[in-house]
A protein has these predicted regions:
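Acidic, mature catalytic/reactive cores of soluble proteins
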Residues: 1-324
Length: 324
């Protein structure tokens, strides 16, 4: 399976914004390994080719990757793989220096392209049981099906022929809470975007109304087993629509950062371990990495910890909200 994860994109976007702000603030040149400079040159060349192609975004959702974007992806992905191969054991020791102005302009260009890609991802959306892809909630994952390829004359370790992809189409997955959680970091809150996103998530398939918490994923019904081990679990258990406290806390933290204070305290009343009823099992406060959601077939243990991994719920709470 060829795939991509949007959460990493959102995090990279934030990192680049930070680097640009620091470069603009101090105006100092930056020295990088020559191997990284080579990759940067290839990435900028791919952007030059994309700009020269005259590519423009379509108003319609297109699942077949346009040839211009495929060429861009292929060039950048190859550059990344070449870089990793060269530095897997050591760097050469050679360096390249970028002045602040050049570096700032480069990063600004990268940010524009990433922003366009993030908007494209939201337009393509998610897809699953009861999800028509029009929720406007940022997706977390995509898969890519290779639609045409050419044999390159090479073979793998067991003698099977290898091929180079020439085109591909996009496959969608259900919503995961990590998508909007990471995306909220990128919002500068123009037009109350954070509040709008919060309302979308609250009314989506990610909400466990019985527990007033959030599933780690929406329904996985009908998904391919290529998704991995999460498909082996019954709904409401472990990785299949259970409650992941560490991801929920990250989501609540973004509500705070977005100045959604009323929404934050409302969610914490249902999702914070500090508000667990005293009569509840001690396990709910001790080993609370994952909880059984309202979808689990045994209703008597809804909201109870799975005890699969031993993370302290209170440590998650303290780490996220008391020392951040």
């Amino acid at each position: 399976m060829v795939g991509s994860g949007m959460p990493e994109t959102y995090e990279l976007y934030q990192m680049l914004k930070y680097v640009k702000n620091v470069v603009d603030k101090y105006g100092r040149s930056v020295i990088v390994p020559s191997e990284l400079a080579t990759m940067i040159t290839k990435v900028n060349g791919a952007l030059d080719t994309l700009d020269a192609s005259g590519f423009s975004e379509s108003e319609e959702i297109i699942f077949d990757v346009p040839s211009e974007l495929f060429t861009y992806w292929d060039t950048v992905a190859t550059a990344r793989e070449d870089y990793r191969s060269k530095v897997s054991f050591y760097f050469s020791g050679n360096t390249t220096e970028y002045d602040a102005g050049t570096l700032s302009n480069m990063i600004e260009r990268w940010l524009r392209e990433m922003k366009a890609g993030m908007q494209r991802a939201i337009k393509i959306g998610s897809h699953g049981d009861g999800d028509d892809g029009k929720s406007g909630i940022p997706p977390s994952y995509f898969s890519y099906n290779i639609t045409s390829w050419e044999l390159n004359g090479k073979k793998n370790k067991v003698g099977l022929p290898l091929a180079d992809a020439k085109s591909m189409s996009v496959g969608r997955f259900p919503l995961f809470l990590e998508g909007p959680t990471r995306y909220l970091k990128t919002i500068d809150d123009e037009d109350n975007a954070a509040a709008t996103m919060y309302e979308k998530v609250k009314t989506s398939g990610l909400r466990d109304e019985e527990l007033s918490m959030y599933f780690v994923s929406a329904s996985l019904k009908g998904q391919s087993y290529d998704m991995g081990r999460m498909m082996a679990f019954t709904p409401g258990w472990l990785e299949n629509q259970s409650i992941w406290m560490h991801m929920s806390y990250k989501y609540y933290l973004e509500l705070l950062r977005g100045k959604l204070f009323t929404e934050f305290f409302s969610e914490m009343r249902g999702g914070g371990t500090c508000y667990c009823e005293i009569s509840n099992s001690f396990s709910k406060c001790s080993f609370i990495h994952q909880l059984n959601s309202c979808l689990y077939r045994n209703v008597t243990i809804h909201g109870s910890a799975t005890l699969w991994t031993f993370f302290d719920g209170m440590l998650f709470f303290l780490g996220k909200f008391c020392f951040c």
